Every structure is written in structure tokens, then in C-alpha cells.
Amino acid sequence: MFPIIILISFSFTFLFASVTSGAGGVTNLSTCLINHNVHNFSIYPTKNDQSSSNYFNLLDFSLQNLRFAASYMPKPTVIILPNSKEELVSTILCCRQTSYEIRVRCGGHSYEGTSYVSFDGSPFVIVDLMKLDDVSVDLDSETAWAQGGATIGQIYYAISRVSDVHAFSAGSGPTVGSGGHISGGGFGLMSRKFGLAADSVVDALLIDAEGRLLDRKAMGEDVFWAIRGGGGGNWGIIYAWKIRLLKVPKIVTTCMIYRPGSKQYVAQLLQKWQIVTPNLADDFTLGVLMRPIDLRADMNYGNTTPIETFPQFNALYLGPKTEAVSILNEAFPELDAKNDDAKEMTWIESALFFSELDNVFGNSSDDISRLKERYMDAKTFFKGKSDFVKTPFSMDAMMTALVELEKNPKSFLVFDPYGGVMDKISDQAIAFPHRKGNLFAVQYYAFWNEEDDAKSNEYIEWTRGFYNKMAPFVSSSPRGAYINYLDMDLGVNMDDDYLLRNASSRSSSSSVDAVERARAWGEMYFLHNYDRLVKAKTQIDPLNVFRHEQSIPPMLGSTQEHSSE
């Protein structure tokens, strides 16, 4: 159990003076860190600096999207790895004292690199939480405390060490950091049964811009509401989450069913899928991942029709194999599920099975300790976009999607099913609003390995074109988007008088403009919850210390009041 400490006092002389971003600024920051017992950091190397390999090894370790690894991308002045909550508090205060912008990195999976790149021109640091990754499970209360740097895989593994009938509902990527994942909601294979990861958070420890360590009571219900689904990098730094453990059976069933074929054949399957899956029992999740080509060319499916599209139906059923196959065949006979398509295993084995740790779907390893791994060998360049679907796709819509998918062999399309408990949780329970009325969510995803800007632009433009083609068929007014699939195409906080730095110097009118400009994408991510998030941001971080290109802006009126206290 983590101690609940509301305020940590240090002997800081807190001078918010402007500091030159050159060598003097770095010296001031490093001196401040050392004086407050923070020694685990690496400074951007000078030309002849022998420690450059350490800096770049740290930078690259959790840099998951290679689009942001190019030499011309902005680099952090310092990478800091706090080892304790005291060091984390000192880090925040030292960065503020020396006027460095803070980027917080947990697992480094930000789709737009916001945890390790800043584009507003300010000198910035990365506060990397990988050393703060402890998970403490208490079976008596059926809860666990997970530090913000713990990955989803580490949480899963820690739970499995003490119980084979408890679990946590979150995503399939084990190297994803819990700090960011839960902050954005956290959809996963058990969300139809238990809701999002953020729905199971019962308390949290947040370090704010003043260095205060706040639990749920101390931060207040408005801020506690906001940090669950309101997106990472906005409110402060999550030191730890307290999560509720969820009861699961000892045996669950996984299925991966491949039905490659012509676009017409696959479109007909998908049309039935979208009607069936939202109405399945809560215990059953049946998602779809589609690729334009068969990446498993050595497999013989006995299909005599031309293979134009390769759909993979992924299922998790919280029960035995016989029931799973029976349910599928009764509800979705067109899929023609066989006993051989299903496997019984424990819940933790299913987490490994769907983990893609070996860059394949259906991990064959039985070493569940691999879920603790933080490093991804198979890194790529990628771009993703998202949608929500409220009305069943027509045949025209399905064919449009499959035709666009076929244009890029280095891509996939994901349909995540909704319904179940997701229909029953209020759209205002936490900041994540996409609940009742959604049939499924869509992810458009391109990945590539060419270190060529022209090729990168080609793949990115394909993703944008696909997204634009699907506009008539998805949610509208506003068109919904998932904050964990961050998408800078929707807009950024970098227009004229709204630069992310120097929040306290902006006029009241520019603050209003900033809030209204951010509404363009803020309401796509958060719908009617956007205004409440602005209020929470103004309450917890009025000076906009924690920010990025798509962060929630504060209203300035409270900033001025705060500054005059």
C-alpha cells in the first residue's frame, strides 16, 4: 500500500524567473536537481560529450513511434528518471524554477509523440517514470496500487502472481504505460464486461504543479473525474493509481478465426458482425482486425476464391470453450466457428496470447513473465486515426472501407465492439464519453519501416484519405475520436497568440480564444464533457504547466487570481 501524503515540503526558493535556454539554463536545472537529491538524469550531449550514447539510449528506449526519432525532431534538454515520489516532486519544482517545459513519459506509446517531443519551440525535459513501476496487490480489499510508470503488462502479471481468479480490464499492449493509458480511458477485451480501465480506478495519487501529492479527497471530485479519461499530460503527474480488481473464472476461452476472401465476401461477414457483436452477452467480446494481404502466407485456408482482404476475428469469452463455440455458432453461423478455433486458458495466459510481444497475433509463448517486458523490439513508423460508429454500416460503407484498405499493404483496420456494460455506464461517469449508442469503434492504422520523409508522407496521406472517405458513415456533430489514439490532424494548441508557454502573460480574451480553438478537437474526444474538463484544468493547473499540442487549456481568469495570491 502506498502512503497517502497530501503535501511534501522542501526547502525551495521558488523563483519563476525567465532563464536562458542555453548552457546556463541546463546548469541551473542540473544544479537544482542534484541539490534536491535527484541524480538519475542525462543531459543532451555536446559534440564531444562521451556520454551521448547514454542520453540517446534513454531517449530511444521508450520512443515507440519512429516518426519522432528523426535527427531533426526537437530533443529534450534533459531526460530525468525519478526513483521516488520525493524525487518526482523535486523534479517538477526544479523544472518550474528553471522554466523548462515538462513532458511526461510512461510507456512512450503516444500516437503523436507528445510524451517525448515538443513542437512549440520551448526548451523541454522528459520526466520518464520507468523507475516508478511498482504494483502492490491487496487481495483482502480486492484492490491494487500501481505506480504511474508501471506498464499494463506489469499490472496484469502482478495480479496473476497472487490470484488466478482476479484481473484488470485494460488494453492488449503490455508495454503501454498505465499512467497514460488509464488517463485516456483504456479500452480492452473485457470492456464489454467491466468497462474501461479508468472505470475501475477508485483512488489516485496526483502530483500537481505546486509539488503537492494529492489523493482523491485532496484533489477533489472534479479533478478525480477529469484524470479518468480526460487524457494524459494535462493535470499533473500520476504517481499511482488505486484500481479495483475484477473477478474472472479460472478458465477463459480465446479464439482467432481467419476468414480471408474477396472484398464482397468479407463485407457480408462484417455486416453481420456489426449487428451481432453489440448484442452478445457481456462475457463475450468479438473484435475484428483486417489487413489487405495475408501476412501468414504459409497457412492454407482451403479458400478457392481470390484473397483480397484478410479479416481476423478475435474473441475472448469468460467461460469454457464449448459455450464459446456454441454462442458463436448460434449468433453468427456465417462465421462457421470450429472447436479448433478456440483455446481454453487462464486469464493471464489470454493476456499473453493477445499481447503481440513477438509482433504476431496469437502469441505462442507460455512464459507469462514476458508481460513485464518494457522494451519493444519491433518498432515502426506509424500513424493512426479513430472513429465511432452509431449506425450500422451499409454494404456501400463496408466496401468503401475495404477498397481503401486494399490501397496500402502496410496497414490494418480495427473494429472494436461496444455494447454490454459500455452501454450501461453513464457518459458523464468519468471524462471518457463514448458510451451508449456506439456499435463499435474504428481505428485506421498505417505502419512502415522506410526512413524516408516522402514515403512517410505517403502513408500518412493514405490514412487521412481513408478517414475522409469514411466521414459519411460514422458519428457526426461532432465526429467522435478516442483520446488514446491522439490525432494532431484534428487541430493543435499552437495558433498565433496561443503558444503553450507563458500562460500567465496571456490576456483574458486570448484565454477564451484558446479554449474555443481547442473545442474543435476537444469535443471530438470528449463531446459534452469538454467544458467540465476546462473547469477541472483551471482548478488544478491554472498556469498550464502540464501541456502539449492537444492538452486541455485553462481559463485565464483563475490564472490571474492564482498568481496574485
Swiss-Prot record:
One BP term from GO: alkaloid metabolic process
Location in or out of the cell: Vacuole
Positions in coiled-coil regions: none
GO CC terms: vacuole
Entry keywords, A to Z: Alkaloid metabolism, Disulfide bond, FAD, Flavoprotein, Glycoprotein, Oxidoreductase, Signal, Vacuole
EC number(s) per entry: 1.1.1.-
Glycosylation sites: N28, N40, N363, N502
GO function term, MF aspect, one: oxidoreductase activity
Residues that bear Pros-8alpha-FAD histidine: H109
Name of this chain's protein: Berberine bridge enzyme-like C-2
Chief location: other
All copies of domain FAD-binding PCMH-type, residue ranges: 72-248
Naturally occurring in which organism (per UniProt): Nicotiana tabacum
InterPro entries listed in its UniProt record: BBE (IPR012951), FAD-bd_PCMH (IPR016166), FAD-bd_PCMH-like_sf (IPR036318), FAD-bd_PCMH_sub1 (IPR016167), FAD-bd_PCMH_sub2 (IPR016169), Oxid_FAD_bind_N (IPR006094)
Pfam families: BBE, FAD_binding_4
Needed cofactors: FAD
Disulfide bonds: C32-C94
Family: Belongs to the oxygen-dependent FAD-linked oxidoreductase family.
Signal sequence segment: 1-17
Pathway in which this enzyme or protein is active: Alkaloid biosynthesis; nicotine biosynthesis
Record's function text: Involved in the biosynthesis of pyridine alkaloid natural products, leading mainly to the production of anabasine, anatabine, nicotine and nornicotine, effective deterrents against herbivores with antiparasitic and pesticide properties (neurotoxins); nornicotine serves as the precursor in the synthesis of the carcinogen compound N'-nitrosonornicotine (NNN). Catalyzes a late oxidation step subsequent to the pyridine ring condensation reaction in the biosynthesis of alkaloids.
